[in-house]
Amino acid sequence: MTINAQNFLTTARTLLLGLWLTIIPNLVRADKFTMKTGEIYVGHAEREGVIAGAYDGVKRTLFRATRMASQEPGAGSSAWESFKLIQPRKTNFVSNQMPTILTGMTAEAWDEFGRRKVRYSPPRNVAKTVELTQALIELGPKASKVRGVETYWSSQVSTSIIPRNVIVGLLNRIPKEEKDERLRVVRFYLQAGWFTEAKAAVSALKADFPEFNDVLNNAAAGIYDAELTELMVRWKGQLKGGTPVSVIRPELEKTLKTAEGASAAVRASGLEMLDLINATDELRSRRLRELKAAFDGSRQGNLNAGPGPQYLAEMIEALSKCPEIAEPFFAPFDQYLRNPDGVSPKKAWSIALSAWSGGLGLATDDISVALAYAEAYETITKAAHSPDQADRSKFANRLESLQIPGPEGDRPLSAHEAQTITERVRPLNTLSDDTKNRTLTYRVENDTNSTPTEYLATVPPGYHRLGQWPAIIVLNPGGDPDKAAVAWRREAAERGWIVLAPDLKSTGPYHFSTDEHATVTLCLRDALKRLAINPDRVFVAGGLGGGDMAWDYALAHPDSLAGGIVLSGLPAKYVPPYRANTQMVPLFIVEGELAPGEPQVVMPLVKTLMQKNWDATYVQYQKRGYEFFEEEIPTIFDWASGRRRKVDVDEFQAVAAREGDQRFYGLIISEFATGRSLAPESVNTLGENLKPATLAAKFAGTANQIQITSDGIKALDIWISPRQIDFTKRMDIKLGGRSRFKGMPKVDWNSFLDDLASRGDTRQTYFMKVEIR
């Protein structure tokens, strides 16, 4: 039956689950690709040399084949329900070709008939606006097809971007007597994950067809099973992301009470999860009691336990507010308490105190050493948050004079120990619960610019200063930072991410300027000191003009990021010459097939990155143009969740051609050679007139040596980290094969603390500087 969309819907018979009605499904063949970093892609398998891909009917996801952990043929195969709509065509319908390039794409809201007005600009006349009507001609739970009403326009969109009420309204047009079609609607909702709508549709069917209650009760049970299973997956992810148990438990208990229609097996899984949460809670309560007992016992007999109450309070606060993040530091404490030979409260408290203040690698049962580590932790924490250089100098003197007890006598605090302790430093300020549901505006502290540098920050519900949270920096040059961040906040809150949105205070398009980059860098550094951000899990992201900047910024500052996320960004100016820096920072790039330059510039460039086995993932939306692609955000978070910044590098190769793009793992270009750096206004569109400086370094741990080669650099500062160099042995720094420094490295506590207070990066710390001129 085929009738106009204003009156009726016709169908394309397909089926996903077949839970309660036997119909032969129209199977869609798809493979399942599991990446080594954890994310999963599903689609028809494609292959071009070393580049593999998954096409799901809406988009094509490309990646280097060697980055796959597994490919399961047919494991992603599904049979999706779909509904075809008969939409009108104007009498003057033009059957010409679609535009080959789409720019300036905007769209109005979908109306009740599944249509919307869209506008775009021809690439050769951007001042002109072309308007047409798009109409939905096929609804699917994951993807829906559209065509033009006035002219030929064939495309597809993710169903998730179509308002749910529009789709429900269209499907509600099916006549009440069409039982089988209404059952397919239930399956459609279930496949889309719309459980509320699926349950409402089943209830309506039960009212209209009471004779089929047994079948419909089975259908309802399937819906409850799917909903409860999905909720449990979400709750487990939230717990892992730091959402407190006190938030999850009431939701789980309420759901179990209202999900009486779920099967016994799925309800048992839910009850098992609740039991596990309660058991974990009891275990945590026991640990808190044991921790307090160890602290109290260590002070009996006037034992010199040193600093205690503030650390005990901090540990209890962390274990109560962000247990998933804090608990790993108490593994040595838990293990010691199970010692069959007996337990000493003093040793137990020493282990807890040293692991908390210095990390697992510094855990010790020697209370004197633990107290020294605690003093170093307190000193470094205060210095990291002190804006006064004179105060930091006093803290530096304290660290220099600090002695660590040992079997062969006291010794100074080592650079390695200071590095490990610094990783435990957390912000001092605590956010109240009500601020966790609001967007906060921060002004960069100690900013020397005449115009204050500001940014917006949104923290997840379970945020606490003693935890560590991943962050995404959303860029929107020439636009409102809040508007740019809105699209990211819901998914970020669900997954336990912080969203930062710098106010770039720029007008017009992205300028590729040093000032724009400096604004982002200042905001990141301020946020690292102010908020509990994991510095190894910071990503930069942007769409359209923000995508241009995200691509450019990521390649210009690779050692400060875990990855760059580009939505419809164009690789202009510095990006093509900087492509080699992709080996240091992963990229996730999303483009429309009809975006300007996609087939000529973007796709070929990204393929070269994959061919070199650099970590680049490319998503190409079919028959889509220069758009934001908000529907890709959940996949982006999946991709980002498995990636961390490269900190302990053995070697790197980098290029740079702009003032400000000068820091690479402690090697800082302090002066370019003439002609090797250009201001953005002097750079060609694709950077053909750039001759970037090159910098490469190899950290040879066995020889305690740094081997550097460079071209186009007049002066270089080398900051030394205990991650690459052993400060207890002689060090050799070579440039171009010639030794430029040879001798014992010496810790400069003032430089260490000044750098930490400036950048706020607790994972990349430096203790000595060597200047090469």
Identify what each model region corresponds to.
Residues 467-478:
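Short beta-strand element of the alpha/beta-hydrolase
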